[in-house]
Amino acid sequence: MNAALKRRQARLKRQVRVRRKLRGTPEMPRLCVFRSAKHIYAQIIEDVTGKTLVSASTVNSDVVEGLENTGNVEAAKAVGKAIAQKALGMDIKNVVFDRNGFLYHGRVKTLAEAAREAGLSF
């Protein structure tokens, strides 16, 4: 088994372990983050109905404006601000942060800090 496959399997184990305990309610939906090599995605999900309330990513053209690269820390900061602004527009202030098995470091940490600075609390 190569190193990349081991890392992916370890992330999926962390994801399952955390998802058992973490649920988004109508009062406090779940802010879920996914990161790939080229993009970063964030969505706010209410787990009771299984619906995505708000989403933002570096694939969206409104977030990418003025960015040279979509897979770096600056892009994660832009996505964090965008998701917070959209959430506050829907009167969502409190969320539960789901790092989706990724380590709280780098782009995931930057997205979370940018969302907090823009007004979300978790």
UniProtKB/Swiss-Prot annotation:
HAMAP family hit by this protein: Ribosomal_uL18_B (MF_01337_B)
NCBIfam families per the UniProt record, alphabetical: L18_bact
Gene Ontology MF, one: 5S rRNA binding
Family to which the UniProt record says this protein belongs: Belongs to the universal ribosomal protein uL18 family.
Biological processes, Gene Ontology terms: translation
UniProtKB keywords: Ribonucleoprotein, Ribosomal protein, RNA-binding, rRNA-binding
PANTHER family: 39S RIBOSOMAL PROTEIN L18, MITOCHONDRIAL, LARGE RIBOSOMAL SUBUNIT PROTEIN UL18M
Entry annotated with the keyword RNA-binding: yes
Subunit structure, as described in the record: Part of the 50S ribosomal subunit; part of the 5S rRNA/L5/L18/L25 subcomplex. Contacts the 5S and 23S rRNAs.
SUPFAM superfamilies per record: Translational machinery components
GO cellular component: cytosolic large ribosomal subunit
Protein's job: This is one of the proteins that bind and probably mediate the attachment of the 5S RNA into the large ribosomal subunit, where it forms part of the central protuberance.
Official protein name in the record: Large ribosomal subunit protein uL18
